[in-house]
Amino acid sequence: MRYFKKIVGSRCYLSPVNPDDAEKYAEMLADLEVARNLVIAPQIISLPAEREFVERACKTGYIFAIVDLESDTLIGNCGLDNVDLINRSSECGIFIGNKQFWNKGYGTEAMCLLLDYAFSLLNLQNVMLQVYDFNARAVRSYHKCGFKEIGRRRKARIIAGAAHDVIFMDILASEFTHGRIRVPIEPQEDKK
């Protein structure tokens, strides 16, 4: 599979999602260890359903494949949802579905790249996310990116018979310190 390097970091890059990757995503999401951390955990992800999701995501332009910079291996995806360009706000989500890349900083870097896109190119002011209380690894990663906890919905999710809090976190553009995107804008000469 060929990926396009839209936003590049030191370990990974974000590429527009490709409908041909639907099977890889469906396989990743079929792993309960991966899916339990996501809102979709109780759902059964079929290949046709995942293909439909990816095709829909391609049309929004706000969902990216996360790809390892060294090997060009697809490792997950991230994106913005409910983008409100008038109020300059959005929600975001991420998953690293290839477990070989867990605990190596890929999720943190991919989220920072996504936030850089949101704040530098879309000119958003606020980005919010939700995470389960048992997902300590993700909470630490989000704190590293600059997210702050803004509230909890207590015992709002029952997973494997246990009640868990949903933690709400957000970050403002003024709080984001990991920005890298620089788009050189040079004056165009008037051709007469």
Task: Please report, for each region that a protein language model flagged, where it lies by residue.
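Conserved catalytic-core motifs of GNAT/GCN5-like acyltransferases
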Residues: 128-131, 148-165
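Conserved GNAT acetyl-CoA-binding A-motif
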Residues: 120-130
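A short, well-structured alpha-helix characteristic of acyl/acetyltransferase catalytic modules
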Residues: 1-52, 175-192
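Conserved acetyl-CoA-binding loop-helix of GNAT-fold acetyltransferases
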Residues: 103-117, 139-144
